[in-house]
């Protein structure tokens, strides 16, 4: 049986690879690549899959190898790349992760509303690129609830 991983999706520059590095406990530098990366505990998907609506079917197919989806939202971005209700396309739990929220130009309240519009309920956490404690606690709680 295949080991289920965490699917990480988000716009360009939102911190997908950095987050994957923390979850996988990888001490190496973050590398920029154009391919889907299957790591020990994550599936890191390039932003091109999200930027092109005709690639959505590939995101949904990749979710078959995952036990949950992390949808990243950049607090600096003015617009969301996610379609309304996009999270509902997945049959596995979806967690919204708001990144870059401590920067001057960030607007976490606006981005939280984008999370709600994308179909993510209460499952929203913040990640600043340095401390993944809150996110790891959320993932562990979700694992316990799902019996994974």
Question: Locations of the language-model features?
Answer:
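Conserved G1/Walker A P-loop phosphate-binding module
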Residues: 1-45
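Structural motif
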Residues: 11, 46, 73-76, 100-101, ...
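Short, well-ordered alpha-helical microsegments
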Residues: 16, 78-81, 135
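Signal for well-folded cores of large energy- and translation-related assemblies
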Residues: 24, 28, 60, 64, ...
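Loop/turn-to-beta-strand initiation segments
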Residues: 40, 67-68, 93-95
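Switch II of P-loop NTPase G domains
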Residues: 43-88, 105
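Conserved C-terminal guanine-recognition region of P-loop GTPase G domains, centered on the G4
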Residues: 72-123
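Canonical P-loop GTPase G-domain recognition
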Residues: 104-148
